[in-house]
């Protein structure tokens, strides 16, 4: 089983993750996009990345926004898997939004 991080550990990790918020049992971030087409591209890219890491976020999708929520259900909170995926998502979305 994966170890749940303490609140202090999560907050320390989030110092290195711009825009991510700690919300008790999960972390979240909202990404702004240029338009609907870019929004869907971001969602599909996150889905592929998550599938490759076998760790699946909750996504909220609207016209020019994607909100990502990460938690590890089996641990009942945030784990290193969530932090790793958050970092990967940040890198991926940053690259997509450059174009």
UniProtKB/Swiss-Prot annotation:
Report which reactions are catalysed by this protein: (4aS,6R)-4a-hydroxy-L-erythro-5,6,7,8-tetrahydrobiopterin = (6R)-L-erythro-6,7-dihydrobiopterin + H2O
The transmembrane residues are: none
According to the lineage, what is the superkingdom?
Answer: Bacteria
Q: Which UniProt keywords apply?
A: Lyase
What family is this?
Belongs to the pterin-4-alpha-carbinolamine dehydratase family.
Q: What is its EC number?
A: 4.2.1.96
What's one GO BP annotation on this UniProt entry?
tetrahydrobiopterin biosynthetic process
Q: Origin organism of this chain?
A: Aquifex aeolicus (strain VF5)
Question: What broad class of enzyme is this?
Answer: lyase
Per its record, how is this protein called by name? Answer: Putative pterin-4-alpha-carbinolamine dehydratase
GO MF term list? 4-alpha-hydroxytetrahydrobiopterin dehydratase activity
